[in-house]
């Protein structure tokens, strides 16, 4: 029963131990021990293995070891019994100084598994340090004349221990003259001191020795002592006295070294050495005063030895001391007040504070740009500063308060005129001479989008040959924007409109960045002679600004159309016609006529006719007019001539390369009687055809009248709308191309500056209708005014077909065939010209056209040149077979006007088809009348 109880008790004890260990480990895992300082080697500290719950047998296998953050040799663990003991001397004052808490921190490390335990060992203080005075002996000199209760400070003792071991108490050896004044422990300001309780008498006791003892609060108590040696001094009854207690001196700044400031004097009523006075600065004088002033100890003179600067110090207060040579020395005191007088030796200082830079160019006047502060270290008028600005700038200074100015905007800014202002601010003080300083403020003007892109000119004229490849670069527009950065980033676009039935963008495009204009498809001069459109340039600003430029693209003709034969010949480049010719014709009689037209213009539409030679070298009795296409006899027809004459007429233009068409003309030679029979049959057939044509023409006339009326009304309405609209809409814009034409009197310049504006609305521009005011070069100066040509030039629209070719010119009643050969006369508007002076007349079309320079040269010959100041009597219109005569009228009859002259506009395809149908009937009539008809009806 006893054993069971003992077993249960042991089990409970073990369980309690395990619970404690678990609770210990669940805590911080730390052990706390304490040990007094100066403990001997081997002093027991604690059973660390047991307290950590480690078996003694595990210490070595698990590599039990102790590490210390402090000195690691102070404590050690016995691995045999698991006891922590003192290994070496522990000095708390050496380890922790005067700290109230002192501990040694250990880390216990075991392996398998690895565990770390923290152990804190508190080192307790013991009273092992006695109080210590700074010296073992202290000497004091006290005048015998000192009053009672005079206090003489003493330096106390110190104890290296802490806590109660460092609490000190003092006691003074017994005497009748002095008592000890000990302040409470919490008062650290008032030192330990001796208090005079009884007057001193040097003749009774010249020297007094006292012992001061300090005792700490430890157990046992430790003490420290100091020997006080008090010497009683004889009395020097009179101290030196200055004339005044305060001297005031004014000293200019920047005076040279050696300048006398003042000479002081002090007197002593004593005699002997007690009356001899020595001067000096007081002991509390600053080192700054000593570096600037020197005191003569004998004479009492104060001189300057350093730099006196008013801005550094406006006044110096110098305490002086005069001592006699008695024992003890008695001092006398006075004060020297040196007032420094300011000199204008400091220039103003400017400080610029940037607030809102850069400044937007649309800023309103009054906006504050920068704050400027000024400061002058001088005083009075020398420190009064005024500021001014660079003249002729849009800024001004506004004084906000003392020594502060605001740089404000005074007028409007324009970055495109001046992008940056270097504002010079000048500050000037009121001294004499005046000092000044400057500061530069760089004001950058920030850009706003206030400038639209601008083209170099409002209109460009571009000449492009037809049949260009798709995507061909035809022109480059460029606009300049005076703004900066994204406000100057220009993009280009087309101003879209309709050109006929199609959009402008189907013809051309413009590159948004480079401004290059490209033709998207081959251009056809016969379809579109002038393409007028606008290109818009817009910048990338917000809001975006833009402008437009007008491009007039003239499509230059190329020889891409062969001559086309007109009825009764078949359409195309070849055809056959039959004619009956009487053998009784006289030489030069016109028997037939080949009609042809070329859809090109200029030289490319100038047609010539050639008769191909007959096979076998037989000379044909017929010839063909070079430019008229008229077939006429060269001699009288003979019986030997073949009854059927087959003539091959080659029609070719003057393009490069030349294109041709061939007409076959079959002539049947008959006698005069047979000719009348054939003619009557032809006339009868023609009359029936004419009757049918008359009926058709009536309907055509009615239809044409109706369409014309509708067209006139439409044009009137359109003209009214266009007059009320802006002139830049559609295709109406002034152009400035210069056309230079060569004539018999030299070069003629046709300026478009006075050209009448031709508006084509939203449809394709009909650029063949152009008006020029002829400008002739000035002749030599003369008193007589040279006669000017009448600018009333009119060319009938009925001759438009003749502007492309030399077809059927006899219909105008102008051309006459001479009996003598191929010489021809080209018609003018007013009358037929006489025989040319020599050779063939100049081509009636714009011969010699240079597509690059647009210089027209008429006539291959060298005609007679007109004299200076004279005007040509005729010239040739490009694309026209006519020579225009200029009527010389008196000066008072001149009318300042310009009319339209057509430049080779082709007939529309539908009109040509109708004309071909009408020409078939007309040719039938001509076959019967060819023997007698020498001119066009």
Swiss-Prot record:
One of its GO terms (cellular component) is plasma membrane. Residues 775-787 have a biased composition (Polar residues). Residues 1-29 form the signal peptide. SMART domains: CA. PXXP repeats lie at residues 774-777, 786-789, 819-822, 860-863, 878-881. Pfam families: Cadherin (PF00028), Cadherin_2 (PF08266), Cadherin_tail (PF15974). Disulfide bonds join 96-102. It is a single-pass type I membrane protein. Residues 755-794, 816-843, 887-937 are annotated as: Disordered. It is found in: Cell membrane. The keyword Metal-binding applies. InterPro entries: Cadherin-like_dom (IPR002126), Cadherin-like_sf (IPR015919), Cadherin_CBD (IPR031904), Cadherin_CS (IPR020894), Cadherin_N (IPR013164), Protocadherin/Cadherin-CA (IPR050174). GO terms for biological process: cell-cell recognition; homophilic cell adhesion via plasma membrane adhesion molecules. The chain crosses the membrane at residues 698-718. Residues 30-697 are extracellular. Residues 896-910 have a biased composition (Basic and acidic residues). Residues 719-937 are cytoplasmic. Residues 34-133, 157-242, 243-350, 351-455, 456-565, 587-682 form the Cadherin domain. Glycans are attached at residues 223, 225, 257, 265, 438, 478, 548. Calcium-dependent cell-adhesion protein involved in cells self-recognition and non-self discrimination. Thereby, it is involved in the establishment and maintenance of specific neuronal connections in the brain. Cadherin 1 to cadherin 4 domains mediate homophilic trans-interaction, the interaction with an identical protocadherin expressed by a neighboring cell. This is a head-to-tail interaction, the cadherin 1 domain interacting with the cadherin 4 domain and the cadherin 2 domain interacting the cadherin 3 domain of the other protocadherin. The cadherin 6 domain mediates promiscuous interactions with protocadherins on the same cell membrane. Each cadherin domain binds three calcium ions. Forms homodimers in trans (molecules expressed by two different cells). Forms promiscuous heterodimers in cis (at the plasma membrane of the same cell) with other protocadherins. This is Protocadherin alpha-7. The lineage of its organism: Eukaryota, Metazoa, Chordata, Craniata, Vertebrata.
């Amino acid at each position: 029963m006893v054993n069971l109880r003992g077993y249960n008790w042991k089990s409970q004890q073990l369980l309690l131990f395990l619970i404690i260990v678990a609770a210990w480990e669940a805590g911080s895992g730390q052990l706390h021990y304490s040990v007094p300082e100066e403990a001997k080697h081997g002093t027991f500290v604690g059973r660390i293995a047991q307290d950590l719950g480690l078996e003694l047998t595990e210490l070595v296998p698990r590599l039990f070891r102790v590490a210390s953050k402090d000195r690691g040799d102070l404590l050690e663990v016995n691995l045999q019994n698991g006891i922590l003991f003192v290994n070496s001397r522990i000095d708390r004052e050496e380890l922790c100084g005067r700290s109230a808490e002192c501990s040694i921190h250990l880390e216990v490390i075991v392996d398998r598994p690895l565990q770390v335990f923290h152990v804190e060992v508190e080192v307790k203080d013991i009273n092992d340090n006695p109080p210590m005075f700074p010296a073992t002996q202290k000497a004091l000199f006290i005048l015998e004349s000192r009053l009672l209760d005079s206090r003489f400070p003493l330096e106390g003792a110190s104890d290296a221990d802490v806590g109660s071991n460092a609490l000190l108490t003092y006691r003074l050896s017994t005497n009748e003259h002095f008592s000890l004044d000990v302040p409470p422990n919490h008062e650290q300001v008032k030192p330990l001191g001796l208090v005079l309780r009884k007057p001193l008498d040097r003749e009774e006791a010249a020297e007094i020795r006292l012992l001061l003892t300090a005792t700490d609060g430890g157990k046992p108590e430790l003490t420290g002592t100091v020997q006080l040696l008090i010497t009683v001094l004889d009395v020097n009854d009179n101290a030196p006295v200055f004339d005044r207690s305060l001297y005031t001196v004014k000293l200019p700044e920047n005076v040279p070294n050696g300048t006398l400031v003042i000479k002081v004097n002090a007197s002593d009523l004593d005699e002997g050495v007690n009356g001899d006075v020595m001067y000096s600065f007081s002991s509390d004088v600053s080192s700054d005063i000593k570096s600037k002033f020197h005191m003569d100890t004998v004479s009492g003179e104060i001189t300057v030895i350093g730099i006196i600067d008013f801005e550094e110090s406006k006044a110096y207060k110098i305490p002086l001391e005069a001592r006699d040579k008695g024992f003890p020395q008695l001092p006398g005191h006075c004060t020297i007040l040196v007032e420094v007088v300011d000199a204008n030796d400091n220039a103003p200082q400017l400080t610029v504070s940037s607030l809102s830079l850069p400044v937007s160019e649309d800023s309103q006047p009054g906006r504050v740009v920068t704050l400027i502060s000024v400061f002058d270290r001088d005083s009075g008028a020398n420190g009064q500063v005024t500021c001014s600005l660079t003249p002729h700038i849009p800024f001004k200074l506004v004084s906000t308060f003392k020594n502060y100015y605001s740089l404000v905007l005074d007028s409007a800014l324009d970055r495109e005129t001046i992008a940056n202002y270097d504002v010079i601010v000048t500050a000037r003080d009121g001294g004499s001479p005046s000092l000044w300083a400057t500061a530069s403020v760089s004001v950058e003007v920030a850009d706003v989008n206030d400038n639209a892109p601008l083209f170099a000119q409002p209109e460009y004229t571009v000449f492009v040959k037809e049949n260009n490849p798709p995507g061909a670069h035809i022109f480059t527009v460029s606009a300049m924007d005076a703004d900066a950065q994204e406000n100057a980033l220009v993009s280009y676009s087309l101003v879209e409109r309709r050109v006929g039935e199609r959009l402008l963008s189907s013809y051309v495009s413009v590159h948004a960045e480079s401004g290059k204009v490209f033709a998207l498809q081959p251009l056809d001069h016969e379809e579109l002679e002038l393409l007028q459109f606008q290109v818009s340039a817009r910048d990338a600003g917000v809001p975006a600004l833009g402008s437009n430029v007008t491009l007039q693209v003239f499509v230059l003709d190329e020889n891409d159309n062969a001559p086309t034969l007109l009825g009764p010949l078949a359409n195309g480049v070849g055809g056959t016609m039959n004619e009956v010719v009487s053998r009784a014709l006289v030489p030069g009689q016109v028997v037939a006529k080949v009609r042809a037209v070329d859809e090109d213009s200029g030289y490319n539409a100038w047609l010539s006719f050639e008769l191909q030679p007959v096979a076998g070298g037989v000379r044909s009795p017929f010839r063909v007019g070079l430019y008229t296409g008229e077939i006429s006899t060269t001699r009288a027809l003979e019986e030997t001539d073949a009854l059927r004459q087959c003539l091959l007429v080659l029609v070719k233009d003057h393009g490069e390369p030349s294109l041709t068409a061939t007409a076959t003309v079959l002539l049947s030679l008959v006698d005069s009687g047979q000719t009348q029979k054939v003619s009557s049959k032809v006339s009868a057939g023609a009359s029936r055809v004419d009757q049918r044509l008359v009926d058709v023409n009536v309907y055509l006339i009615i239809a044409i009248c109706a369409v014309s009326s509708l067209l006139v009304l439409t044009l009137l309405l359109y003209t009214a709308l266009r007059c009320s609209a802006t002139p830049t809409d559609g295709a109406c814009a002034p152009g400035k191309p210069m056309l230079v034409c060569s004539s018999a009197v030299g070069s003629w310049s046709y300026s478009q500056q006075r050209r009448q504006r031709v508006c084509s609305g939203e449809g394709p521009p009909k650029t063949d209708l152009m008006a020029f005011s002829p400008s002739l070069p000035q002749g030599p100066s003369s008193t007589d005014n040279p006669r000017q040509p009448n600018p009333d030039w009119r060319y009938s629209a009925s001759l438009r077909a003749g502007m492309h070719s030399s077809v059927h010119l006899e219909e105008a009643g102008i051309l006459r065939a001479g009996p003598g050969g191929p010489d021809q006369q080209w018609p003018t508007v007013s009358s037929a010209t006489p025989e040319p002076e020599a050779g063939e007349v100049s081509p009636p079309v714009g011969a010699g056209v240079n597509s690059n320079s647009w210089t027209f040269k008429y006539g291959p010959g060298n005609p007679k040149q007109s004299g200076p100041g004279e005007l040509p009597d005729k010239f040739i219109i490009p694309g026209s077979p006519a020579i225009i005569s200029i009527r010389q009228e008196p000066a008072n009859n001149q009318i300042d006007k310009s009319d339209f002259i057509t430049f080779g506009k082709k007939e529309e395809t539908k009109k040509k088809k109708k004309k071909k149908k009408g020409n078939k009937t007309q040719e039938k009539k001509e076959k019967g009348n060819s023997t007698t008809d020498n001119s066009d009806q």
